Curated annotation (Swiss-Prot):
Protein name: tRNA uridine 5-carboxymethylaminomethyl modification enzyme MnmG
Compartment(s) where it occurs, according to its Swiss-Prot or TrEMBL record: Cytoplasm
Major localization class: cytoplasm
Subunit (UniProt): Homodimer. Heterotetramer of two MnmE and two MnmG subunits.
Source organism (scientific name): Ehrlichia canis (strain Jake)
Gene behind the chain: mnmG
Length: 625
């Protein structure tokens, strides 16, 4: 008989982070996967990061997660998206050598302390009654082996009753050539979880030797690539180029003439796909006024002959894929290595979860990744690390949930959106979803989260010490710049343009001026050069945003006050005067943990919030008296 503190099902991006996080905290953890050879597989595009997504990778890394370190080992084309805009919307992104990424992740996972990996298929899990509540008891494999555990994390990705479509061809699969998870889907139905259906897609893979690169636009990465991980010193792999081409009217004509043959137009038309990553068929249908759509040709590795054509996800038959591709410049003689396809799969209504990602129905059961209705490697990793941390922490009798607020992290924004609002389509993060994005930047994730992770043993002492040294240097440089006061006349002598208004300013204050940067003020303060690039950059960004932080920090304080006004889990909303039946039902279903969470539920009015506050204050005063 085998027993583990935490069992994780699925070896994708959510599963790897969940298993590693639980193990770091000290839980005896088991990761179960269909195939060890697919742990860390990049199922779709060979890239990590992007706008908002790159910040999530940094947040995962700040909590000692794996994704940032692994992509730094596999990066072959790095860039900062939105570099021309402010730091709050910078998006670190890196193309990966797909094979090196997977191999690096597998090496880490297979040698992780406290973590065992088992190659098996889980068909069912059992529950027991614990203090009048259903709790996880064990998982059962397809070979009828029983593995006992009180904490189970499901990270099934697109495998939960997954079905692949290529035109009219349909086959059960979670990924091309890999069997779906049918038994677990039936188990979730048995326990009355609210299930829905979503879909996503992937483009055909192309033979690099059949592409005419001479007619394509070369796109180089950053000359000095920036690592994702705060503990990575450099990017060591050679950096290679991507190439840009585009569809045209001939391409669109082929697609229009064959829309009736695409699975997305027929079998899948009622199943929601990612809104912000539409198929090429959907692009042509929705944006009929557009004459072309960009296609980025991305190498899948340094020694790979496969090209990933980003921008032409399709569910059309193979003959249509060929006909469409051969109208695109550079692809006139292209060979397809693997067909593009669409995959549909089950997901659960994430409003059935707490902010810890534990289910409300069954104690000890957690969901993370695409099973919660999200799309993207980064979103999955962010959920995985939170589920893993909470599953491990909850083994203790004095367990305090590890919850990241909307003001703490993009991960907090995502989870709060999911468990409060739910989703009817694949959810992805954007900077626009974060109210406090001036504070939630990709450059400061370690300053925001590493100490929080260290307090719950999710972060190593080595990383924490590095953070404290960095914080000390940031504080030192900031104080130096704040204590050097200079007049406009003195600044003019250094050719630094400011208004000649006679007002004395500190060097730190000067950084908020639009035409002044840290390099400019280095003329006055040589000591800046003694600090690391990361520290100098951090101080410069803080100086740039300083005037805007005053308002945002006040908003954050108001938000935190509402988040700290807790609503008891056993509250009877039907007993609160002034709440309509509809609002009572919504609140009873979602069970918001705080006034802040209740306020974000659609349909819950300001008057309803006031009624809840009055009720809470009355009962608090009654208890005191």
């Amino acid at each position: 008989m085998s027993h583990y503190d935490v069992v994780v099902i699925g070896g994708g991006h959510a599963g790897c982070e969940a298993a590693a996080a639980a193990s770091r905290i000290g839980a005896k953890t088991l990761l179960i996967t269909h195939s060890i050879s697919t742990i860390g597989e990049m199922s779709c595009n060979p890239a990590i990061g992007g706008i908002a997504k790159g910040t999530v990778v940094r947040e995962v890394d700040a909590l000692d997660g794996l994704m940032g370190k692994v992509i730094d080992k596999a990066s072959i084309h790095s860039s900062i998206l939105n570099r021309s805009k402010g730091p709050a919307v910078w998006g670190p992104r890196a193309q990966a050598d797909r094979l090196i990424y997977k191999q690096t992740m597998q090496e880490i996972i297979l040698n992780y302390p406290n973590l065992t990996v088992l190659e098996a298929s889980v068909e069912d899990f059992t529950i027991t009654q614990d203090n009048q509540k259903d709790s996880v008891k064990a998982v059962i494999t397809s070979e009828q082996h029983t593995i006992y555990t009180s904490k189970l994390i499901l990270t099934t990705g697109t495998f939960l009753q997954g079905t692949i479509h290529i035109g009219s061809y349909t086959t059960p699969a979670g990924r091309i050539g890999e069997q779906p998870s049918i038994g677990l889907a039936k188990t979730l139905e048995k326990y009355n979880f609210k299930l829905g259906r979503l879909r996503t897609g992937t483009p055909p893979r192309l033979d690099i030797n059949s592409i005419n690169f001479a007619v394509l636009q070369e796109q180089k990465g950053d000359i000095h690539p920036s690592p994702f991980s705060y503990i990575s010193q450099s990017i060591d792999l050679p950096q290679i180029s991507c190439y840009l081409t585009a569809t045209n009217n001939k391409t669109h004509e082929v697609i229009k003439n064959n829309l009736h043959r695409a699975a997305a137009s027929n079998l899948l038309k009622d199943i929601k796909a990612p809104r912000y990553c539409p198929s090429i068929e959907e692009k042509v249908r929705r944006f009929s006024d557009r004459n072309s759509h960009q296609v980025f040709l991305e190498p899948e590795g340094l020694n790979s002959d496969i090209i990933y054509p980003n921008g032409i996800t399709t569910s059309s038959p193979l003959d249509v894929q060929y006909e469409m591709l051969k109208t695109i410049p550079g692809l006139e003689k292209v060979n397809i290595v693997r067909s593009g396809y669409s995959v549909e799969y089950n997901f659960i209504d994430p409003r059935e979860l707490y902010h810890t990602l534990e289910t409300k129905k069954i104690s000890g059961l957690y969901f993370a990744g695409q099973i919660n209705g999200t799309t993207g490697y980064e979103e999955a990793a962010g959920q995985g690390i939170i589920a893993g941390i909470n599953a491990a922490l909850s083994l203790s009798s004095n367990y305090e949930p590890f919850i990241l607020k909307r003001s703490d992290a993009y991960i907090g924004v995502m989870i709060d959106d999911l468990v409060t609002l739910g989703t009817s389509e694949p959810y992805r993060l954007f900077t626009s979803r974060a109210e406090y994005r001036l504070r939630l930047r990709s450059d400061n994730a370690d300053l925001r989260l590493t100490e929080l992770g260290y307090k719950v043993s999710a972060v190593s002492s080595k990383r924490y010490c590095a953070l404290k040294n960095k914080q000390h240097d940031i504080e030192s440089l900031t104080n130096i710049l704040k204590n050097i006061i200079i007049t406009p006349t003195q600044l003019a002598a250094y050719d630094i343009p400011v208004s000649q208004d006679g007002v004395k300013r500190s060097i730190f204050d000067l950084l908020s001026h639009p035409n002044i940067n840290i390099e400019t003020v280095s003329k006055i303060c040589d000591v800046i050069k003694k600090f690391s690039k990361a520290v100098v950059s951090q101080v410069e960004i803080e100086g740039k945003y300083a005037p805007y932080f005053i308002r945002q920090d006040a908003d954050i304080q108001d938000f935190i006050e509402e988040e700290n006004t807790h609503i008891p889990s056993n509250i009877e909303f039907s007993q609160i005067h002034g709440l309509s039946k509809e609002i009572q039902e919504k609140l009873a279903h979602i069970k918001p943990p705080s006034i802040g969470s209740a306020r974000r539920i659609p349909g819950v009015t300001p008057a309803a919030i006031t009624s809840i506050l009055i009720y809470l204050r009355y009962h608090k005063n009654k208890k005191i008296s």
